[in-house]
Each structure stands twice: as structure tokens, then as C-alpha cells.
Amino acid sequence: MKNITELLELLRSDLNQYNSLVEEDILKLLQNKGAYFLFEYDYEWLEISAWAMNKEGDYISQRIDIPSKKKEKYFPSDIFMDKDIHLEDELYDHGVEEDEIDDYLDEYAQKKEDIISKWFQQRWKNALKNAHIQADGYFSPHDSYFYTDLNTGKQINEDQIKEKHSQG
């Protein structure tokens, strides 16, 4: 659907405006010298929270918000957030059948999550490469048991993360 495609393109464009700022924020977090780093984003508001963790799986840093500075009131942009919040209403207004709306919204949510995850993974890789650092980081929606390993792109769960780092 055209509305969803345009909205996803807006998301990509808006996220890319934050590339250097987010990479700087990642480097600041890496100064905590954790065994690994967790990044979680709020699915509705896209705010990213980050922590340094020790090998026992305990937090060793204060929560850091990424991006640390916003260009507008909302991240990634006020326009995107407004359109994102009103997408369901817009589908109804365009006469989309109710049973199709759920399918559209599910497809949109999956694509949005994929875009955010791949974008953040690239920010992570760029930050590490530019600083000549090796570190482990994991990214997920807030309060999820499953994370994306930012170095490999593969899914890993909380228990596997803790087990991996408690052995090192």
C-alpha cells in the first residue's frame, strides 16, 4: 500500500539524519568498559535506552538515552511520529476493509522493526570500526526476551547472552 511504503521511506530518511549522533552516543556508552551492551527501543515512541552490563548480567552504567539529542520533539521526526500514530485511522479513511487493516498493520510493524534494527546495527558497526574497538551489543524492542546480536545480525535470547558472557 502506498501510504505504508511512503511512511517506511520517511522512517529510513529520518533515521539517517541521526547516523553520526547515534554513533557518537554508542562510543560514549562504550567508555563504560562493560562485558556487553544492551540496547532496547520503545516500540511505540522509538526511544532507545542503553546500558553497559558486567559478565554476571548486572547493569554497570546508568541508562543512556539514544539519541542523546533530538532534532525535533520526537525521534526520528515529528512528521513521522504523527503519521505513524494515525496510520490505522488513515487506512479506515481510505476505505480499507477492517480485516485487511490488521494485515496491513502487522506487515507495517514487521517492516518498521526490520528497518530500525538494521539501521541501528549499522550504526553499531560503524562506531566500532571507526574507533577500532571490539565489543558485544544486543538490540531489541523494550522488555523482549529476544535480541539481535549487533555483530552477527542473528537472534539470541537473554539466557544465551548471559551464558556467553559469564564464561568469558
Model-derived regions: residue spans:
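Amphipathic protein-protein interaction modules
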Residues: 69-138
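A generic signature of intrinsically disordered, low-complexity regions enriched in glycine/proline
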Residues: 44, 58, 82, 86-88, ...
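Short linear interaction motifs
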Residues: 14-33
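Acidic, proline/glycine-rich low-complexity IDRs
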Residues: 1-13, 30, 108-168
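Alpha-helical context
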Residues: 2-6, 15, 96, 100, ...
